[in-house]
Amino acid sequence: MDLKIGDEAPNFDANTTVGKINFHDWLGDDWGVLMSHPADFTPVCTTEIGRVANLKEDFSKRTGKVRVLSVGTKPGLTPLESHTEWIKDVNETQGASVDFPLIEDPDKEIANSYGMIHPNASDTLTVRSVFIIGPDKKVKLVISYPASTGRNFVEILRVIDSLQLTAEYQVATPVDWKHGEDCIVVPAVPTEDIPGKFPKGHTIVKDYLRTTPQPNI
């Protein structure tokens, strides 16, 4: 399945390293990040999982819940045994304390429902997919990285900031925007309505390019 922005995130029941979950129930009214990694006990994936664990507070203050899925597990172990043993390595080598769930998907049902397996890359392992999902259970962002390239989680946090801001206010965020910087007033807002909606002030660069200080700080 090729999920697109605005599609409903497929729901699923799954076993994880912290017990069984229903994905939509777990999300509740929060934002969620669902990621896939190619395989346990691999170098790039190990650094990624450690990085996410060390950014726990940054995700938490954005009410961003994290779930990680893997279909590549260690031979001789069940998927959950593989995940659990690998977490020990992640904690040891990355100075981390992984406490978010890793999902087992032995039949690749979840991976296929999210389009995480790209046959031109590998027909058995997932690519490095990222799905940001809103409280309405709709997909807000989709990114796919090749197996050779680790993800930039600072960028993922930046996108969550932008998505949460623009879900509440009639603004967009410009190139390289970071939390605390000026935003763009969306074209749907008439210029004469800007002072009432954005009392912090605004700047008219062009009639189609109006900026305002970030409204929620």
Protein language model regions, located:
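Chalcogenol-based redox active-site neighborhoods
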Residues: 1-217
